[in-house]
């Protein structure tokens, strides 16, 4: 967790081998990630960014320089330095794990969420008791509504939600809990 930007970064490993990937790495914390990987005897092979935004100063390029990992984003990203651009419903593999890319625009036009089994890494699209802002940097409230209500909230209620930000110290929720308690989801339409 980066206290300056309130950004959560996730390190994922299959548990069956040494490969790891990182979702939404923060540039200022790259050395911390490298130390964690070394301590756990993991090799970073992939880095995924959910989107580009002012509060997402990515450490992907620096991690690539250090570890030779692949950098991944959704195919709507304007970023030139990304090696692999995944499409909606495409899978990213990490040893025996499969992570589904889900195009979820709204917060930004390049926002993606990533689903691994029943774990959703939602970037800034769906937050705990909130949603990502749509009022600047290529945001669109209708796209956000469609991404959240017609895609993410269609996932099973027991799906765990891991957002890229939280400003109140919450770390995890579920789709079911968000449907019931998230004040921004208590709307009929846009």
Q: What is the role of each PLM region?
A:
Residues 1-2, 13-14, 61-62, 83-84, ...:
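Short secondary-structure boundary/capping segments
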Residues 1-42, 113-123, 129:
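Conserved beta-strand hairpin/beta-sheet module of binuclear metal-dependent hydrolase folds
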Residues 5-6, 17-18, 27-103, 180, ...:
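Active-site HxH/HxHxD metal-binding segment of metal-dependent hydrolases
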Residues 12, 24, 51, 63, ...:
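Divalent metal-coordination and catalytic microenvironments
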Residues 18, 98, 108-189:
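Metallo-beta-lactamase
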Residues 22, 52, 133:
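Generic anion/oxyanion-binding catalytic loop in active/binding sites
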Residues 23, 71-73, 122, 163:
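Hydrophobic residues in well-ordered beta-strands that form the structural core
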Residues 26, 56, 137-141:
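Short, conserved glycine- and acidic-residue-centered signature motifs
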């Amino acid at each position: 967790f980066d206290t300056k930007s309130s950004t959560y970064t996730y390190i994922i490993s299959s548990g069956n081998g040494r490969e790891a990937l990182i979702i939404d790495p923060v540039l200022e914390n790259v050395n911390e990630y490298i130390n964690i990987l070394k301590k756990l005897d993991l090799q970073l092979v992939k880095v995924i960014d959910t989107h580009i935004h002012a509060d997402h100063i990515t450490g992907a390029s620096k991690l690539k320089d250090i570890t030779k990992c692949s950098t991944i984003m959704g195919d709507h990203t304007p970023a030139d330095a990304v090696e692999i651009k995944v499409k909606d419903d495409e899978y990213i593999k990490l040893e025996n794990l499969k992570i589904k890319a889900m195009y979820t625009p709204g917060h930004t036009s390049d926002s993606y969420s990533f689903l691994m089994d029943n774990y959703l890494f939602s970037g800034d699209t769906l937050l705990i008791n909130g949603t990502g802002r749509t009022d600047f940097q290529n945001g669109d409230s209708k796209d956000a509504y469609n991404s959240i209500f017609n895609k993410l909230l269609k996932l099973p209620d027991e799906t765990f939600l891991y957002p890229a930000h939280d400003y109140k110290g919450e770390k995890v929720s579920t789709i079911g809990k968000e449907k019931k308690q998230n004040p921004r989801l208590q709307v009929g339409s846009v």
